[in-house]
A protein has these predicted regions:
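Ribonuclease/tRNase effector modules and their secretory precursors
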Residues: 1-104
Length: 104
């Protein structure tokens, strides 16, 4: 028998911020949750400012485009703080990471 599948991730977010993101960028936080399904995605700590909590940036592809999702973990849930399409520097770095990754 194979390994048990991982439990589904649970997400939460501020609905007003999600709606503002939709108005500004054309997609909301619900759409951004798809980035976490990217098996070649990765996360890194977000230490740009002293936020008072651990924050992370997750890089994952949705429909062939790279997205950045900033989030924290609260009570076993992923709380999305912001999301955007990756910039050209991030896209290039992600491509290099994938090229350098060992084959599974």
């Amino acid at each position: 028998m194979g390994a048990d599948p991982l439990p589904p991730l649970e997400f939460e977010w501020d609905d007003n911020k999600s709606q503002q993101t939709f108005q500004d960028r054309g997609f909301d936080f619900g759409f951004a949750t798809q980035a976490f399904s990217d098996r070649s995605g990765f996360r890194e700590p977000d230490q740009r400012l002293p936020y008072g909590e651990d924050r992370f940036r997750f890089y994952g592809e949705i429909q062939g485009k790279l997205f950045v999702v900033v989030y924290t973990e609260r009570q076993g849930r992923i709380r999305i703080i912001s999301t955007r399409k990756a910039n050209s520097r991030e896209i290039q770095a992600h491509g290099q990471r994938r090229a350098d990754a060992p084959e599974a």
